[in-house]
């Protein structure tokens, strides 16, 4: 808890360093800590409180006020996100069903750094396009066969489905700017 205060109130150079972890502020944000892990872990430069590849900055939580403590577990859990995680069956129903708004599907993995970065943009867009688009996400580790069938090769991959089912879906792969996503939703669908 004290480390969280130090990491958020002090400049990165004054923040404490844990063995195997480096603290530094992310670009374009207020000073907070980010971490990198050694020992073959997949974590590098992600925001605190995000668990990737089993690596987490010890004693530091993203936003304790926004998390709920699970008694007896010693864990804090974040509330549900705005973008719903769906299964293969749910996605099939959404794609084949009648829609009045575009459907945007985010194929991601919890261990994927660019996926975590883009998830923040997707959440913001879900609020911005609340009544004009439907955003869902698919965890490729949980839905491997669906990801394979949808030819998801790199992460994150976004699919854009128009409400007009005669139009082909659009696909992007990799971390793309939020303005590009807006442009696709506003002009291409």
Swiss-Prot record:
<protein>
    <recommendedName>
        <fullName>Thioredoxin-like protein CITRX, chloroplastic</fullName>
        <ecNumber>1.8.-.-</ecNumber>
    </recommendedName>
</protein>
<dbReference type="InterPro" id="IPR013766">
    <property type="entry name" value="Thioredoxin_domain"/>
</dbReference>
<keyword id="KW-0150">Chloroplast</keyword>
<feature type="active site" description="Nucleophile">
    <location>
        <position position="115"/>
    </location>
</feature>
<feature type="domain" description="Thioredoxin">
    <location>
        <begin position="72"/>
        <end position="189"/>
    </location>
</feature>
<feature type="site" description="Contributes to redox potential value">
    <location>
        <position position="114"/>
    </location>
</feature>
<feature type="active site" description="Nucleophile">
    <location>
        <position position="112"/>
    </location>
</feature>
<dbReference type="InterPro" id="IPR017937">
    <property type="entry name" value="Thioredoxin_CS"/>
</dbReference>
<keyword id="KW-0809">Transit peptide</keyword>
<feature type="site" description="Deprotonates C-terminal active site Cys">
    <location>
        <position position="106"/>
    </location>
</feature>
<keyword id="KW-0934">Plastid</keyword>
<dbReference type="GO" id="GO:0047134">
    <property type="term" value="F:protein-disulfide reductase [NAD(P)H] activity"/>
</dbReference>
<dbReference type="GO" id="GO:0015036">
    <property type="term" value="F:disulfide oxidoreductase activity"/>
</dbReference>
<dbReference type="InterPro" id="IPR036249">
    <property type="entry name" value="Thioredoxin-like_sf"/>
</dbReference>
<keyword id="KW-0676">Redox-active center</keyword>
<dbReference type="InterPro" id="IPR044182">
    <property type="entry name" value="CITRX"/>
</dbReference>
<dbReference type="GO" id="GO:0045454">
    <property type="term" value="P:cell redox homeostasis"/>
</dbReference>
<keyword id="KW-0249">Electron transport</keyword>
<comment type="function">
    <text>Probable thiol-disulfide oxidoreductase that may play a role in proper chloroplast development.</text>
</comment>
<dbReference type="Pfam" id="PF00085">
    <property type="entry name" value="Thioredoxin"/>
</dbReference>
<comment type="similarity">
    <text>Belongs to the thioredoxin family. Plant CITRX-type subfamily.</text>
</comment>
<dbReference type="GO" id="GO:0009657">
    <property type="term" value="P:plastid organization"/>
</dbReference>
<feature type="disulfide bond" description="Redox-active">
    <location>
        <begin position="112"/>
        <end position="115"/>
    </location>
</feature>
<keyword id="KW-0560">Oxidoreductase</keyword>
<dbReference type="GO" id="GO:0009507">
    <property type="term" value="C:chloroplast"/>
</dbReference>
<feature type="site" description="Contributes to redox potential value">
    <location>
        <position position="113"/>
    </location>
</feature>
<keyword id="KW-1015">Disulfide bond</keyword>
<feature type="transit peptide" description="Chloroplast">
    <location>
        <begin position="1"/>
        <end position="56"/>
    </location>
</feature>
<keyword id="KW-0813">Transport</keyword>
């Amino acid at each position: 808890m004290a480390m969280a205060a130090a990491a958020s109130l002090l400049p990165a150079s004054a923040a404490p360093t844990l063995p195997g972890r480096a603290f530094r502020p992310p670009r374009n944000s207020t000073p907070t800590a980010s971490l990198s892990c050694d020992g073959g872990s997949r974590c590098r430069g992600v925001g605190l409180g995000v668990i990737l590849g089993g690596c987490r900055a010890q004693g530091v939580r993203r936003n304790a006020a926004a998390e709920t403590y699970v008694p007896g577990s010693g864990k804090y859990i974040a509330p549900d996100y705005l973008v719903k995680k769906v299964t293969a069956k749910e996605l099939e129903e959404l794609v084949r069903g009648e829609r009045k708004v575009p459907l945007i599907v985010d194929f991601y993995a919890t261990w994927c750094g660019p996926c975590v970065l883009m998830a923040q943009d997707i959440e913001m867009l879900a609020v911005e396009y609340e009544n004009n688009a439907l955003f869902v996400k698919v965890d490729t580790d949980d839905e491997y066969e669906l990801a394979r069938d949808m030819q998801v090769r790199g992460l994150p991959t976004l699919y854009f489905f128009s409400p007009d089912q005669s139009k082909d879906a659009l696909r992007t792969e990799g971390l793309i700017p939020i303005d590009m996503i807006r442009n696709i939703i506003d002009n291409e669908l």
